[in-house]
Regions:
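A short, flexible beta-alpha/helix-coil linker loop
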Residues: 100-103, 160, 307-311
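C-terminal catalytic and target-recognition region of SAM-dependent MTase-like enzymes
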Residues: 289-384
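Short, charged/polar, Gly/Pro-enriched secondary-structure boundary elements
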Residues: 44-51, 159-162, 378-380
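Class I S-adenosyl-L-methionine
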Residues: 96-98, 144-186
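Conserved S-adenosyl-L-methionine
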Residues: 175-295, 310-311, 315-317
Length: 384
């Protein structure tokens, strides 16, 4: 079966999580770089990666990689790529995004235009036609240039994979589903342990945790661009992968996941999002301020995305908010806490230095993932 190189972009700082997910699917990693993991897989792997990977933004099919320091080089080397292997005669194709870092070629619009012309020239020669109707399936191309090395990939996903199909209602400053899933994977939380988000917003952390607990694949309720590419990914692969995903779901799983927020409207949005994700029965949402945070059980997890204070009036309220969060966390003496924030004084007002502090870029925003590890619960005796 034909093999492809596939690229899974991810948040900077979370490449190890992405790598682990891909290995768990059984694919061979060929490269790990800042913000992306490359692996080898067949046509079925394109379907599996899109449906099952929780932490990537999209899956790119690598068309080629080359060095280019001039637009002439870019044109010639783009034209030399085997575009006919991927794009049929009636295909609609364009460079949807180009980014350049530390490279001589830096104008995205020029890069896009020149590469499209080169692709057209190649396909005109191969297909013996002068004009492309482009009435068939879509083939968007994404290009990244780093230190003059051009990487070219076909976007197999279409709409970003963080869009699972359940978030219809959004709270202010939401965390993306892919980032929330990756952060949950950085914690030792398992489905038999308590998880509480005291600033749950539209419910992303609780919903992603519940989907993991119920083994609901993140791409089960959406479509993908490569479903149109029958010559590359036969329809049978998509049916088989979706059947596999459906067979793993366990909606009867027992788990204790809770989400609190001071805003009642936000809680209603979170409940609706959970319903659309088919996990509303697994999560308890409640309107509650962080000052009332408590739980009768031990050895739980707080996983949260507190307010960052992007506006001045919000920033002035942050010291007290983080002080109260730290106070309530200390009252939960056997618990662990994991929070992502861009607020640099978070540890100071929480009143305790984190055991680990990981820098993560949420888009262009530099954030910190503070990790406070609590004690492990005692092991159950045999026969209990």
């Amino acid at each position: 079966m034909e093999k492809f190189e596939l690229i899974a972009p991810c948040h900077f700082g979370l490449e190890a999580v992405m790598k682990r997910e891909i290995l768990d699917l059984g694919y061979e990693i060929t490269a790990v770089e800042d913000g992306k993991v490359t692996f080898e897989g067949d046509a079925e792997a394109i379907a599996y990666a899109n449906v099952f990977l929780r932490t990537t933004e999209r899956i790119l099919l690598k068309v080629g990689q080359f060095r280019a320091e001039t637009f002439e080089e870019l044109f010639e080397k783009t034209r030399a790529l085997p575009w006919e292997r991927y794009i049929p005669k009636d295909g609609k194709f364009w460079v949807t995004k180009a980014n350049s870092v530390k490279s001589r070629l830096f104008s995205p619009s020029d890069i896009q235009s020149i590469m499209k012309k080169a692709m057209v020239e190649r396909l005109k020669t191969v297909y013996h036609i002068q004009w492309f109707e482009e009435t068939g399936s879509s083939f968007p191309i994404r290009v990244s240039i780093l230190k003059d090395v051009v990487t070219v990939g076909l976007d197999t996903s279409g709409v970003s994979l963080h869009k699972r199909g359940y978030r219809k209602l959004t709270a202010k400053a939401p965390i993306t589903e892919t980032l929330a899933a990756a952060l949950l994977m950085l914690t030792p939380w398992k489905k038999d342990r308590i998880l509480v988000d005291p600033f749950c917003g539209s419910g992303t952390f609780p919903i992603e945790a519940a989907m993991m607990a119920a083994q609901i694949a993140p791409g089960m309720n959406r479509s993908f661009l490569a479903e149109q590419w029958k010559h590359l990914v036969p329809r049978k692969h998509w049916y088989d992968v979706m059947d596999d995903a459906a067979s793993r779901v366990d909606l009867t799983v027992e788990t204790d996941i809770q989400g609190f927020d001071i805003d009642g409207d936000v809680i209603r949005s979170a409940r609706e999002n959970a319903r659309l994700a088919q996990v509303d029965h697994l999560i308890h949402f409640q309107q509650r301020p962080v000052s009332e945070l408590s739980h009768p059980r031990k050895y739980g997890f707080l996983v949260t995305n507190p307010p960052y204070g992007e506006r001045l009036e919000e920033k002035e309220a942050l010291p007290e908010l983080y002080r109260v969060l730290g106070e309530r966390f200390r009252a939960l003496d056997s618990w662990s806490m994991y929070l992502i924030t861009s607020y640099e004084d978070a540890q100071r007002y929480i009143g305790k230095k984190a055991d680990k502090n990981r820098k993560i870029y949420n888009g262009m925003l530099r954030t910190y993932f503070y990790q406070y590890a609590g004690p492990k619960p005692p092991k159950k005796r045999t026969g209990e």
